[in-house]
A protein has these predicted regions:
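Sec-dependent N-terminal signal peptides
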Residues: 4-14
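Positively charged, low-complexity terminal tracts
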Residues: 18-145
Length: 145
């Protein structure tokens, strides 16, 4: 219940700033917003593609966007692949990716279970863990318009 209240407060306080961030993706509708240590993650859809968007704790930084695919099943596979890849990375190492829109990398932190997904070409970043990525997967099971 406490987590739900925190998420709701984050959603309400993020509203006006989220509108400004949305302009980065040309009026992308934000479907889910999850507060993470050091950042915020949202699921969104634009031009028939599903994206994972991440902002740093400084919510005035630009969001960066990871293209997850055209449908829910593909998006879930993309996130599962990120989790599996992160599991193979040694601590304090990273793997670079390019989704056709942006370059980003998945980095294994020094803390147990810590995974960073960070863009190479944008200011924003997200800090998450395997468990929190699974929460994003769970949220994605809701309909994304």
């Amino acid at each position: 219940m406490k987590k739900l209240v925190i998420i709701l407060i984050a959603l309400l306080s993020f509203g006006a700033i989220a509108d400004a961030q949305v302009s980065v993706t040309k009026k992308t509708k934000i479907e889910r917003l999850i507060s993470l240590r050091g950042g915020y993650v949202s699921m969104s859809r634009h031009n028939d593609l599903i994206y994972l968007s991440v902002w740093s704790d400084n919510r005035f930084d630009e969001a960066y966007i990871i293209n997850l695919g055209r449908d829910k099943a593909t998006a879930m596979q993309s996130l599962e692949a990120l989790i599996e890849i992160a599991d193979t990375i040694k601590k304090d190492e990273s793997i670079d990716f390019n989704d056709g829109l942006h370059e980003y990398y998945v980095y294994r932190g020094l803390l147990k279970g810590e995974i960073w997904i960070k863009a190479n070409d944008r200011a924003g970043y997200g800090i998450t863990s395997k468990g929190e990525l699974k929460k994003i997967l769970d949220h994605l099971t809701f309909e994304v318009y």
